[in-house]
Amino acid sequence: MSVTQEIHLKTIRENRGISQVELAALSGVKLRSIQMYEQKVNDIDKAQARTLYKLSRVLGCSIEDLLENPEL
C-alpha cells in the first residue's frame, strides 16, 4: 500500500476538523477500522461499499476520494 491511502482518508478527515473518534461516532464505522485504514494496516480499497459510503457521507466527499486506486 502506498502513502496515498493515508493522505486520502486522514487528510480529508483532518481538513474537515473531525477527529477519528468523531468520525467513528458520526459514521457508525468502528474507531479501530478507521485507525487501521489510516495506518495502512487495512487496505481501504477492499472496504465494504457500505463502509465507504458512511465515511464519504460524513466527510462530504466522494467514495473515489477515499480510495487509493479508484480506477480499479
Pin down the residues of each PLM region:
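Recognition helix of helix-turn-helix/homeodomain-like DNA-binding domains
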Residues: 29-45
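Short amphipathic recognition helices of helix-turn-helix/homeodomain-type DNA-binding modules
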Residues: 65-72
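A short, Lys/Arg-rich alpha-helix, primarily the initiator
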Residues: 1-15
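Short coil turns linking two alpha-helices in DNA-binding domains
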Residues: 19, 30-33, 48, 62
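DNA major-groove recognition helix of helix-turn-helix/homeodomain DNA-binding modules
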Residues: 49-65
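Alpha-helical residues within the helix-turn-helix
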Residues: 14, 25, 57
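Conserved hydrophobic/aromatic packing and binding residues within compact polymer-binding modules
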Residues: 9, 23-24, 34-37, 66
